């Protein structure tokens, strides 16, 4: 399965049914290390839409009660399964990424942590 993009790289690839399996695999890992319900983790973005061409990056939504609860414990838990908090500044969203290489050049997964019942979550789910 082709997965990942380098910084500033743009690539659209044909739909791959393995994207769903990869999301499910990562979701299980997240459920194992985080104190969240299954309903708080969802596959979003173009790889979540069956049959659609997409950028080969798995986007995952993590719904939290509030963004202030994203503390060192949650960051360490996500780090333990290979995710790094990005310095991306987005209002009402914290972004984590997983990389395919030790040089942190090729991103394969994003976790978008947003308020569980907030507007951003609704917009991200609506796209799907």
Model-derived features with residue positions:
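Catalytic core of pol beta-like nucleotidyltransferases
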Residues: 1-55, 64-75, 79-128
